[in-house]
C-alpha cells in the first residue's frame, strides 16, 4: 500500500458542504489541506441520486439552495467550477402556501411589492402591516444577512444584530420574548396570512414555539430569505461537485472511506487525527501543522473525537443536553408524467410556476399542534403536515427527469424517535402507510398527482440517520436552533466558535444560526483561522453576503426590490 502524505497545515474532519468550502478557502489561499470523509462520496446531506430508475434524479436532502446568499459562491468561483443555480423561467414568486378554499399566500422571489400586492387580495390590512415592515427592513437586508450568516457571532454582535430591529414601527416592544406564534398573531389578523407566514418561517427554525429563535425566523420570512430558493442544474449535488473541483484544482487532498477515530490532543492543543481501524489506512495518524477543523456535529466532535477528559465540566454538561430535536423530515418523492397543477392556481396561477411550497395546516391551531406533536409529545401528526420546504424541481430544472416528466418532493415534519412505537426502527414498519397518508393530503392541493403519478420514493428520518448518523434525526447536523442554542452560545457558552476550548481546534458546523447551503459557517471558520495565523486574506477573498445573488439577478434581468415603496 502506498503511504500518503501524513502531514498537512490543516486537517478537516468531514467532507460535508462546510468542510469542503472551508478547505477550498484555505487551500486556495495557499495552505495545504487534507479532508477526511467517512463515506465514499462528499456532501452526504446534499446528495442527488437515481434511486428510482435511470434519468430520475432525486435530491435526497438539501433541495432549497441558498448558495447565492453567501460569499463562497463569488470567492470560490463556484460557477466557474460548474455550479448553475436554476429557478422556473420567468418566476416572480419563490414560495407559496395553498389553502383548501383555493387561496394561496404568495411570497415574492425578489420584489417586496409583489408580495404586498398578493397579500392585498387576502387581507388589505395585513398587507399594510407588511409594507411598513418591508420598508423599514428592506434597506437593512444585506447587513442583516452578513451579521446572521457570514460573521463571527459574539455576545456583542448579537446586541448589534438586535439593534437592527429596535425601531420597526409595528413590532411589539417585547417581541423578543414572544414565541413565533405569538409574534405573528400580534402582527397580523387574517388566519391565512398568519399560517402562510408561519409555514415560510418554519423552514428557517426548528421550533416556532421558541422565544427568540421563533420571532427571528418570522423576520427571515418577512425579509424574503425563505422565498429565495433555487435548485442546481442536474441536482443539488452539483454544489458538492463545484466545491470538490475548486478544492482539488488548488491542490487539496480528499481521503474517502476514512472515518476518523479521534482527534489527537497534546498539551491542550489539537495536533492531528487517528483514523479508524476500518478506514483505507487503518489506525493511521495524520499530523496538522496549524489546525484541525471539524465539520461534524457538536456531540460527535467533542464527546466522541475529542473526549470528555479534555473538556470542562460546564462544556460537558452543555454538550450532553445538546438539542437535536425538531426539523425531522419524512419525505415523499413523486415522478409525474404531466406538469404539477395546483388547485389554488385557479385563483393564483403564479403558484404553478413557483419552486417551493408547503401544505397541510389550515389554521394556526393546527400549526401549533404540529410542533406540539413533533417536539413536545413525540407523536406522529395525523394527518401529516408538510412544513419542511417542498420542491417542484423540474419546473426549474427539466434535466432532473426524463423529457415530459416532473419530480415533486414533500417534506413532512415528524418526531424522530417514535418511542411510543418502540423507537426509530419503527419507521421501517410504517414507511409506506405514513407515505400514503402524506400523499392523500397533498392530492387535496395538487389534484393531478392522483392521475399523473408514475412512481414514488420514500425517505424516512431513520434513512437520513443511516446516511449521516451525526445528524441525530435533525435536518441539520448543527442541531436545533432555539433560544438556548444559537448565536454565540452555540454549541455551548464559552466555546467561542468557530474556535473551541482546545487550542488549534476549530469547528465549521454546529455554530451560530442554521447551517444551510449558504456556506456561511465555512466562510467564518476559514476567516477566523487565517486571522489567528496572522495571514492576510488574499485579494480574491473579499465577497460579502448577497454578492452572488446580485450577480445572479443581474444576469436574469430582474430588479431586486427589498421595500414596497
Curated annotation (Swiss-Prot):
Q: What pathway annotation does it carry?
A: Terpene metabolism; monoterpene degradation
> Could you tell me the EC number(s) of this protein?
1.17.99.8
Q: How does activity depend on pH?
A: Optimum pH is 7.5-8.0.
Q: If you read the UniProt record, what top EC class would you report for this enzyme, in one word?
A: oxidoreductase
> GO: which molecular function terms?
oxidoreductase activity
Recount the known activity regulation: The presence of molecular oxygen causes a 40% reduction in specific activity.
Cofactor(s) for this protein? FAD
Please provide the record's keywords in A-Z order: Cytoplasm, FAD, Flavoprotein, Oxidoreductase
Provide the function of this protein.
Answer: Involved in the degradation of the cyclic monoterpene limonene. Catalyzes the oxidation of limonene at the primary methyl group, forming perillyl alcohol. Hydroxylates the R- and S-enantiomers to their respective enantiomeric form of perillyl alcohol at a similar rate. Native CtmAB oxidizes a wide range of monocyclic monoterpenes containing the allylic methyl group motif (1-methyl-cyclohex-1-ene). Can also catalyze the reverse reaction, the reduction of perillyl alcohol to limonene, but with lower efficiency. Cannot use molecular oxygen as an electron acceptor.
Family the entry assigns: Belongs to the carotenoid/retinoid oxidoreductase family.
| Subunit | Heterodimer composed of CtmA and CtmB.
What name does this protein carry?
Limonene dehydrogenase subunit A
The protein's organism comes out as Castellaniella defragrans (strain DSM 12143 / CCUG 39792 / 65Phen)
Record gene name: ctmA
Amino acid at each position: 500500500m502506498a503511504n500518503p502524505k501524513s502531514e498537512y497545515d490543516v486537517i478537516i474532519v468531514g467532507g460535508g458542504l462546510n468542510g469542503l468550502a472551508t478547505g477550498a478557502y484555505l487551500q486556495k489561499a495557499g495552505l495545504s489541506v487534507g479532508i477526511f470523509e467517512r463515506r465514499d462520496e462528499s456532501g452526504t446531506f446534499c446528495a442527488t441520486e437515481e434511486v428510482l430508475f435511470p434519468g430520475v434524479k432525486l435530491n435526497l436532502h438539501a433541495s432549497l439552495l441558498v448558495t447565492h446568499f453567501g460569499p463562497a459562491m463569488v470567492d470560490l468561483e463556484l460557477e466557474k467550477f460548474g455550479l448553475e443555480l436554476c429557478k422556473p423561467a420567468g418566476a416572480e414568486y419563490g414560495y407559496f402556501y395553498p389553502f383548501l378554499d383555493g387561496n394561496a399566500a404568495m411570497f415574492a422571489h425578489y420584489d417586496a411589492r409583489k408580495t404586498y400586492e398578493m397579500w392585498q387580495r387576502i387581507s388589505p390590512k395585513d398587507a399594510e402591516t407588511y409594507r411598513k415592515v418591508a420598508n423599514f427592513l428592506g434597506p437593512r437586508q444585506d447587513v442583516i444577512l452578513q451579521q446572521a450568516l457570514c460573521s463571527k457571532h459574539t455576545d456583542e454582535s448579537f446586541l448589534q444584530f438586535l439593534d437592527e430591529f429596535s425601531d420597526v414601527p409595528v413590532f411589539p416592544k417585547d417581541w423578543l420574548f414572544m414565541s413565533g406564534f405569538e409574534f405573528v398573531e400580534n402582527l397580523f389578523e387574517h388566519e391565512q396570512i398568519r399560517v402562510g407566514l408561519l409555514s415560510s418561517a418554519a423552514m428557517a427554525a426548528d421550533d416556532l414555539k421558541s422565544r427568540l429563535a421563533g420571532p427571528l425566523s418570522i423576520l427571515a420570512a418577512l425579509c424574503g430569505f425563505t422565498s429565495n430558493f433555487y435548485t442546481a442544474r442536474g441536482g443539488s449535488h452539483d454544489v458538492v461537485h463545484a466545491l470538490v473541483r475548486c478544492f482539488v484544482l488548488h491542490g487539496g487532498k480528499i481521503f474517502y472511506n476514512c472515518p476518523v477515530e479521534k482527534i489527537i490532543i497534546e498539551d491542550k492543543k489539537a495536533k492531528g487525527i487517528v483514523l479508524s481501524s476500518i478506514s483505507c489506512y487503518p489506525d493511521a495518524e495524520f499530523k496538522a501543522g496549524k489546525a484541525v477543523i471539524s465539520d461534524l456535529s457538536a456531540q460527535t466532535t467533542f464527546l466522541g473525537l475529542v473526549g470528555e477528559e479534555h473538556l470542562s465540566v460546564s462544556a460537558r454538561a452543555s454538550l450532553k443536553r445538546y438539542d437535536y430535536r425538531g426539523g425531522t423530515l419524512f419525505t415523499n418523492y413523486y415522478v409525474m408524467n404531466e406538469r404539477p397543477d395546483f388547485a389554488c392556481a385557479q385563483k393564483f396561477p403564479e403558484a404553478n410556476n413557483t419552486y417551493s411550497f408547503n401544505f397541510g395546516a389550515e389554521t394556526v391551531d393546527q400549526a401549533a399542534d404540529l410542533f406540539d406533536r413533533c417536539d413536545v409529545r413525540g407523536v406522529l401528526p395525523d394527518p401529516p403536515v408538510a412544513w419542511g420546504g417542498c420542491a417542484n424541481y423540474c419546473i426549474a430544472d427539466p434535466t432532473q427527469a426524463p423529457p415530459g416528466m416532473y419530480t415533486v418532493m414533500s417534506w413532512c415534519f415528524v418526531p424522530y424517535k417514535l418511542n411510543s412505537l418502540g423507537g426509530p426502527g419503527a419507521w421501517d414498519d410504517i414507511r409506506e402507510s405514513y407515505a400514503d397518508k402524506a400523499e392523500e393530503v397533498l392530492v387535496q392541493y395538487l389534484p393531478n398527482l392522483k392521475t399523473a403519478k408514475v412512481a414514488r420514493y420514500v425517505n424516512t428520518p431513520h434513512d437520513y440517520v443511516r446516511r449521516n448518523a451525526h445528524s441525530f434525526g435533525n435536518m441539520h447536523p448543527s442541531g436545533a436552533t432555539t433560544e438556548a442554542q444559537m448565536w454565540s452560545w452555540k454549541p455551548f457558552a464559552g466555546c467561542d466558535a468557530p474556535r473551541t476550548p482546545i487550542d488549534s481546534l476549530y469547528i465549521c458546523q454546529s455554530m451560530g444560526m442554521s447551517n444551510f447551503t449558504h456556506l456561511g459557517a465555512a466562510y467564518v471558520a476559514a476567516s477566523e483561522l487565517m486571522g489567528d495565523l496572522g495571514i492576510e486574506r488574499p485579494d480574491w477573498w473579499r465577497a460579502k453576503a448577497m454578492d452572488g445573488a446580485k450577480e445572479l439577478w443581474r444576469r436574469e434581468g430582474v430588479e431586486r426590490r427589498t421595500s414596497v415603496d
